[in-house]
Amino acid sequence: MRLILATSNRGKVKEIKALCKDFKVIPYSELIEEFEIIEDASTFKGNALIKARAVFKVLSQKDEYKDMVVLADDSGISVDVLGGAPGIYSARYASKGASDKENLYKLIEDVKKSGAKGSPAHYTAAIAIVTKNYEYSVHGWMYGDVIAEVRGDGGFGYDPMFIPLGYDKTLGELDDDTKKNISHRAKALSLAKIILQTL
């Protein structure tokens, strides 16, 4: 089965490909020109569905993609000491179009401004699957703590400041195999794969 990803984020593409080896995973940007998708829902699930529906709508106008399956992910980090921020704004926390590094340093600065050296936090991943006849969504979570510093250079996004529950290293310091077993996206994808195998 061809699984078309409604993302061109290299980090997400790499992680999803590694976790979905049973499928031919193709970022939509390899099939058509990238276009802006306005993510204006108030939840991760809502934004994942917006992305999947938008890519499905454009691609379904071409005969060769009529029976495709589109998968979209919306994910982010919620920090307790910041009242759950950045939440659904994780990808644009520093500003619209901000880089991973800019978002990371903005979050570190905001945690420091709160007077804390760290805080309980969690990642959420919502995955939406859109086909010709159905829409599905699943979630995965990873709990832990953020620290107000960068440790490690692996992963992407906020990984260098997030220490998963039960570990003493950040996601930026952990190896890929360990992360595959504990990440919010891996948990959501394991549920998504159950759905995909029935299609």
Swiss-Prot record:
Binds 1 Mg(2+) ion per subunit. Its EC number is 3.6.1.66. Keywords: Hydrolase, Magnesium, Metal-binding, Nucleotide metabolism, Nucleotide-binding. InterPro entries: dITP/XTP_pyrophosphatase, ITPase-like_fam, RdgB/HAM1. It comes from the Bacteria. One of its GO terms (biological process) is nucleotide metabolic process. The active site is at residue 74. Its cofactor is Mg(2+). GO terms for cellular component: cytosol. It catalyses: XTP + H2O = XMP + diphosphate + H(+); dITP + H2O = dIMP + diphosphate + H(+); ITP + H2O = IMP + diphosphate + H(+). Mg(2+) binds at residue 74. Substrate binds at residues 7-12, 75, 156-159, 179, 184-185. GO terms for molecular function: dITP diphosphatase activity; ITP diphosphatase activity; metal ion binding; nucleotide binding; ribonucleoside triphosphate phosphatase activity; XTP diphosphatase activity. Pyrophosphatase that catalyzes the hydrolysis of nucleoside triphosphates to their monophosphate derivatives, with a high preference for the non-canonical purine nucleotides XTP (xanthosine triphosphate), dITP (deoxyinosine triphosphate) and ITP. Seems to function as a house-cleaning enzyme that removes non-canonical purine nucleotides from the nucleotide pool, thus preventing their incorporation into DNA/RNA and avoiding chromosomal lesions. NCBIfam families: RdgB/HAM1 family non-canonical purine NTP pyrophosphatase. Homodimer. Belongs to the HAM1 NTPase family. This is dITP/XTP pyrophosphatase. It comes from Sulfurimonas denitrificans (strain ATCC 33889 / DSM 1251) (Thiomicrospira denitrificans (strain ATCC 33889 / DSM 1251)).
